[in-house]
């Protein structure tokens, strides 16, 4: 089978790196059953009868080992660009003391006991505490073979902030990295989702959460991460959109730097190459999708659930959690619940939104003249305010703060019709493969666990042009993975009308 050869070559390549004697003989891998076991254990499961989907198997050799004793922390973002390069947004501040034992004290950084500390605030009175390891920079670029091409940015890249992300230029690195996107012009966009910790600092309040005295490499101390940043591929700062708010406001249009809209903990970013419009999933505090000009950052429009504009923040906050609504029979919330976690645009103009706080996805038409404009759709009707349809994703799943909710990330298969919709679920730890035409479930990829091909807090899903899938985990998952595609290029047939639910 082609996939056995493909995976065998990948594993043989890994063996070469490790110096294994059997590296050149991929037949050994086939004969001892390793490849068959990988295919059986990490392939598509819960397949709907009479349907077709791409097939996958994990590549346990990807990525290649990182240099400089670097380790990845939680992965706040992952995206495959037009060159089939994989861009990763690492959270170095999520690493624990034992994971960064090789890190030394930061010059002049002391804790409350006047003891030298490293960049994450862990005490280093005698220099490095162990032989391993160091936090990798925040932005990393890999090729499809897993080779690291570039790495830059953030609080674990000493000296970079002073040169490339200066407050005088408008750059503020987020307190917690979240979301990365590379547009058709090779601009790198990132966001963050730190919440504001209390009153403004000038009024004696707390600093933004996660940027206190434990973090001498603290970045955003002014408020919540209410902005996104634009860089070139080498990490040179180009623009900031947004500000550092102290409260959420899902209808802000121009409260940020240079009159740009202020976000509140934005989660995801995409740029439409046909219109140069920037779409932001806003987010962990606000409850909307923002549309802005990708060159100037200026506001164009915004919309909430079912295309409603303005967004009723008060009603959403008063409603509480989705499981409570569901238990009470209120099964059609007229607002996004936090977090609004992703926004994606298909080639046919459909916009897909992860309404993670409501365990659902919603679909909109980017070409609708009503989308983003003041519009009322009180009954959630398709065809009004740019709204097209929706699908529940394991809708009985608990949401924050009990469980993280379901619809966390989406992407499309690279066939001409983009016929598959991949939906990541970071509570049930799987990727649902939907027929994008009818939003029925055709199968699943991955299960909960720590082994290759399994997930813990699955956070991102992104394909390359060949159909291979790349994934990223947060919480204690802290890894990126590659799934090799084989078999059909796209999806067809009508699967299970209900997406999610317990299955073997």
Task: Describe the function of each predicted region.
Residues 1-6:
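Positively charged n-region of N-terminal signal peptides that target proteins for export
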Residues 8-19:
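Bacterial N-terminal signal peptides
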Residues 24-504:
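Eukaryotic scaffold repeat domains enriched in small/polar residues
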């Amino acid at each position: 089978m082609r996939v056995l050869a493909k995976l065998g070559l990948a594993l043989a390549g890994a063996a070469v790196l490790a110096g294994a004697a059997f590296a050149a003989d991929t037949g050994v891998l086939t004969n001892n059953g390793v490849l068959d076991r990988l295919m059986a254990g990490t392939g598509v499961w819960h397949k709907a009868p009479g349907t077709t989907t791409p097939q996958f198997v994990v590549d346990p050799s990807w990525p290649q080992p990182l240099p400089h004793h670097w380790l990845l922390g939680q992965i706040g973002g992952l995206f495959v660009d037009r060159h089939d390069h994989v861009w990763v947004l690492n959270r170095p501040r999520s690493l624990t003391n034992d994971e960064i034992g090789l890190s030394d004290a930061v010059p002049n950084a002391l804790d409350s006991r006047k003891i030298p500390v490293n960049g994450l605030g862990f005490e280093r009175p005698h220099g490095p505490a162990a032989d391993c390891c160091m936090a990798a920079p925040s932005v990393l670029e890999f090729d499809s073979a897993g080779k690291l091409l570039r790495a830059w940015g953030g609080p674990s890249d000493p000296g970079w902030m002073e040169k490339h992300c200066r407050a005088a230029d408008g750059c503020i690195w987020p307190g917690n990295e979240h979301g990365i996107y590379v547009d058709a012009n090779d601009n790198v966009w990132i966001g963050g989702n730190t919440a504001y910790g209390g009153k403004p600092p000038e009024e004696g309040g707390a600093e933004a959460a996660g940027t206190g005295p434990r973090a001498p490499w603290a970045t955003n101390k002014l408020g919540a991460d209410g902005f996104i940043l634009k860089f070139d591929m080498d990490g040179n700062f180009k623009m900031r959109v947004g500000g550092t708010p102290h409260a959420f406001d899902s209808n802000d249009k121009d409260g940020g730097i240079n009159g740009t809209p202020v976000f509140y903990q934005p989660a995801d970013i995409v740029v439409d190459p046909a219109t140069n419009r920037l779409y932001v999933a806003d987010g962990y505090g606000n409850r909307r999708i923002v549309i802005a000009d990708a060159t100037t950052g200026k506001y164009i429009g915004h919309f909430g659930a079912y295309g409603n504009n303005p967004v009723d923040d008060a009603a959403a906050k008063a409603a509480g959690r989705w499981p409570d609504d569901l238990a009470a029979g209120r099964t059609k919330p007229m607002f996004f619940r936090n977090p609004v976690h992703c926004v994606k645009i298909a080639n046919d103009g459909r916009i897909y939104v992860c309404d993670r706080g409501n365990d659902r996805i919603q679909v909109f038409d980017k070409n609708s003249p009503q989308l983003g404009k003041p519009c009322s759709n009180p009954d959630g009707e398709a065809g009004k305010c740019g709204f097209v349809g929706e699908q529940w994703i394991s809708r009985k799943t608990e949401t924050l703060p009990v469980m993280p909710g379901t619809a966390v990330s989406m992407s499309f298969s690279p066939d001409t019709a983009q016929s598959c919709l991949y939906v990541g679920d970071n509570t049930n730890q799987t990727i649902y493969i939907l027929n994008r035409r009818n939003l029925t479930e055709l199968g699943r990829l991955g299960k909960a666990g720590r082994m290759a091909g399994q997930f813990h807090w699955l956070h991102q899903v992104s394909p390359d042009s060949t159909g291979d899938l790349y994934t990223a985990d947060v919480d204690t998952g802290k890894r990126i993975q590659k799934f090799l595609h084989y078999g059909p290029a796209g999806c067809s047939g009508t699967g299970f009308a209900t997406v999610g639910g317990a299955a073997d």
